[in-house]
Amino acid sequence: FDSFKVQTPYCYRCPLGKNREECSIDCLGAVEEVLKKNAGEIAAIVIEPLLLGAGGMIVYPVEYLKGIWELSRKYNVHLIVDEVATGFGRTGKMFACEHAGVEPDFMCLSKGITSGYLPLGATLTTEEVYKAFYDDHDKLKTFYHGHTYTANPVSCAAAVASIDLFKSDNSLENAAVINRSLGSFLSGMAELSFVGDVRSIGVVGAMELVKDKKTKEPFGLNERVGLDIYKRGLENNLLLRPLGNVIYFFLPLCTKSEELDDIFSRASIILSGG
């Protein structure tokens, strides 16, 4: 499909040159401009809610997500949210959309639906969209979307077991505990000369490494700083996965306090060059 793209709401490297204190979510203007000019051609807006994963674990303001939803209503286009990485408690709520009170037209789910034990994906939609394809067979309105591994029983069993855990334990409460510990650790790491930005939401945290803290100059692609830290982590029995110049944590909801202490203690030693 043809698509239109707008700049990422990236607060640390704001394309409008603003900082968090003076931000009024002006970056929504670029989205509205595209919608104004092309609303008749646009079927939907697709977005990762609150956390841009592969882009560098970029956490953006709740107001931006809410603004996107309001624009989708204003210009009568569907809103599709990709909760593959953010769903099932990763941001501190069951789904990231809840932080902004957003009700999307489509929600894409995977990963956490089975706690990662088996592959499974799901697409949720509204009653209105469902009814658009619901009619007598001879009306030819059916959306034929089946595929070979639909409703794989083993994956579905894993999903049911995973969802049952949310009903029976305190996973979301534990996410808040993890976030406090993660935030405290990241605040300490922010003092390092090569850490330009730290950000977190729920059980996800990230540090953006820079060559120059004042100018925000990034390390060059060939310097492989993230890879060096990853290798040092392995030597200390800790997996610190880099995304370019970003080192991030994607912690399980069941992580215990003593495990957090161990993880952050090892990470501090590795990042401090110990």
Each predicted region: which residue ranges?
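Conserved N-terminal phosphate-binding loop of PLP-dependent enzymes in the Aspartate aminotransferase
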Residues: 1-274
